[in-house]
A protein has these predicted regions:
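Alpha-helical transmembrane segments and their immediate juxtamembrane cytosolic regions
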Residues: 1-238
């Protein structure tokens, strides 16, 4: 499967999930379908970070769109719940720190010990980044929690597809366990629902590393706020 096909599966899954939440809250199977979205998007956040030519621009694109959606949501719902784009913004920030550490580890050492200082500084930045994310996730409600933030980071740790798939599988399982145990959740039912996210593992295993026939670079960024707006407007009418 190409990246385009998997991203379209994620988009449809997300849309079905949000339709279920807003318009048909009693139709539980819609939520089950929705469990495919987050892990697939998380995998391709890591892929996007891996291939982007401008990581700062990549971060800002996700963060600013997430911030805009967050402001609208917070004003409308009058509660602080950090949405998935802010989750992925934190993922990109941590991946940038990890990437710096990986680069520092590959630089040959010099008599002045510059490599050691660079590795130490990069490791400190990684620790601070992960610690800050953990503090944020412990202080406010973040979509998919700390494990959700770290899922793309896990995927980004290796360039080898089998290793990336293994890391992705571990990350999806961690997200499953964290989400099923969130305060206020009925653990048994929520665990069964979240377990459907494991279906993304064979889907990612089928990923062929190709972009796909059509380049829809910005479509998925536009689709996220657009489908939420349409669903919200429909909810006002019905």
């Amino acid at each position: 499967m190409s990246a385009l096909v998997l991203k379209l599966i994620a988009a449809v899954s997300m849309c079905v999930d949000h339709v279920g939440i807003v318009l048909f809250p009693k139709v539980v199977w819609l939520r089950y379908i929705g469990r495919l979205a987050f892990p697939l998007y998380a995998y391709f956040i890591a892929e996007g970070f891996r291939y982007t030519h401008d990581r700062l621009h990549y971060f800002l694109r996700i963060f600013l769109l997430g911030l805009g959606c967050q402001i609208v949501y917070t004003v409308a719902e009058k509660q602080l719940y950090l949405g998935v784009l802010l989750t992925f913004s934190m993922s990109v920030a941590v991946m940038a720190c990890v990437s710096r550490l990986k680069t520092a580890l590959t630089v040959p050492d010099t008599p002045t010990g510059e490599r050691g200082r660079s590795v130490a500084l990069s490791a400190l930045l990684c620790a601070l980044a992960v610690g800050t994310v953990f503090l944020i996730c412990s202080s406010v409600t973040v979509d998919y929690g700390f494990c959700g933030v770290m899922l793309p980071v896990l995927v980004s740790l290796s360039e080898k597809k089998p290793v990336r798939l293994a890391l992705f599988s571990v990350g999806v399982a961690a997200v499953l366990l964290e989400c099923a145990g969130l305060p206020g959740a009925f653990v048994v039912n929520d665990f069964v629902m979240q377990a459907f996210s494991l279906l993304t593992i064979p889907l990612v295993a089928l990923y062929n590393g190709r972009l796909g026939k059509y380049k829809l670079k910005y479509f998925f960024y536009i689709f996220y706020p657009a489908h939420l707006a349409v669903i919200y407007l429909i909810s006002l009418i019905v």
